[in-house]
Structure formats: C-alpha cells, structure tokens
C-alpha cells in the first residue's frame, strides 16, 4: 500500500476534525482494538488537534499533533502505524516470522505460509482478516502490520501461499513520513 508512497506527491489535503467526528473515530478504534482503552486518552489527548491527511488511492492518515497514528483505505478498518505500534506493542496480536523471511517482508512482500511455520517462527491463533503485528525472530519491535489472509489453523494445515498480507512495513513511504503539520 505504501511501497511507492511519497509525501509530496501522494498527499492531497489535510483537514482538522470536529469533536463529534473525533468521538466517532475513538469509538471505532475502541471497537476495533479493545486493548487500547486505558491508553486511548494518552494516544489521542482531548485538547490536541486531530487531523485527517487525505492521500491518493483513498488513503486517510489520522494524525494528532502532527504524529501519524492510524491509517485506513476508503471507509475500511483503521491500522496502527509502526511508530505507534513500537510505543504500544500490545495494540495488535503478534505473529512471528523466521529470520529468512525478514528481508522479503522489509521489501514489501506478503508473508508466505512457510515463513510462519518453520523453526524460529511463532504462529499464534488468529482468524481470517485479523490485523496483526509481524515480529521477527530475535528482534524486539514489529517490522510490519498485516492482515491474516488465512486462519492460523489453515496456515499450519496448508503451508502454501500467502498467509498474511503486508500492509505497512519498516522503511516504506509511510514510515519515512515522520510527522505532518
């Protein structure tokens, strides 16, 4: 989604949100990420300006004080940015890839089933369409945000094809877009 993303070319406009819209977004975030509730006011303080940065391909990035927090495509689900995920790693369930998959994931490739079932990888129970943080064997922080394309059970059984779709990864266009004022 952000492989060829460039802040100067892809951002079309930025709008400050009304309090009622912010409340609706907070409710949607609580519904989507129940574990975020104790930290939501810390992540999105009440008095700080919340803006939506509109980009090409119907991508919207939610910012607070210029810090990129969440993004979504069209009216779809919100995904946390990796910068937010590094501060609050418990927001998403984790899946771990083996060392051999790291370079492919960091170049934007989807996570294949063998990268999740081999020694060094850890596959935790998750349903289809669950948003997950992809961790790497021997590393502390997430290297990618993805969406389960198969359930964890099916990944173990089939062990072929795409297991997790790579949505946002370290060093992609969104990662390089540090803040937006």
UniProtKB/Swiss-Prot annotation:
Main location per the UniProt record: cytoplasm
GO biological process terms held by the UniProt record: DNA damage response; ribosome disassembly; translation reinitiation
Record PTM Phosphothreonine, positions in chain: 81
Keyword flag Protein biosynthesis: yes
Compartments, record wording: Cytoplasm
Modified residues (Phosphoserine): 118
Stretches assigned to the PUA domain: 92-171
Family annotation (InterPro entries): MCT-1/Tma20 (IPR016437), Pre-PUA (IPR041366), PUA (IPR002478), PUA-like_sf (IPR015947), Uncharacterised_CHP00451 (IPR004521)
Role description: Translation regulator forming a complex with DENR to promote translation reinitiation. Translation reinitiation is the process where the small ribosomal subunit remains attached to the mRNA following termination of translation of a regulatory upstream ORF (uORF), and resume scanning on the same mRNA molecule to initiate translation of a downstream ORF, usually the main ORF (mORF). The MCTS1/DENR complex is pivotal to two linked mechanisms essential for translation reinitiation.
Protein name as catalogued: Malignant T-cell-amplified sequence 1
């Amino acid at each position: 989604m952000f492989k060829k993303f460039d802040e100067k070319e892809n951002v079309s406009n930025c709008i400050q949100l009304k309090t009622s819209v912010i409340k609706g977004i907070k409710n949607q975030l609580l519904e989507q990420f129940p574990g975020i509730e104790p930290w939501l006011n810390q992540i999105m303080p009440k008095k700080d300006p919340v803006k939506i940065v509109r980009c090409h391909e119907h991508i919207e990035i939610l910012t607070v004080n210029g810090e990129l927090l969440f993004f979504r495509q069209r009216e779809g689900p919100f995904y946390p940015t990796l910068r937010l995920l590094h501060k609050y790693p418990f927001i998403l369930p984790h899946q771990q890839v083996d060392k051999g998959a790291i370079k492919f994931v960091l170049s934007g490739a989807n996570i294949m089933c063998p990268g999740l079932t081999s020694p060094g990888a850890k596959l935790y129970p998750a349903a289809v369409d669950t948003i997950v943080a992809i961790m790497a064997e021997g590393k502390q922080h997430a290297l990618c945000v993805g969406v389960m394309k198969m359930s964890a059970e099916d990944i173990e059984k089939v062990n072929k094809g795409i297991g997790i779709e790579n949505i946002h990864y370290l060093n992609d266009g969104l990662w390089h877009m540090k803040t937006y004022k």
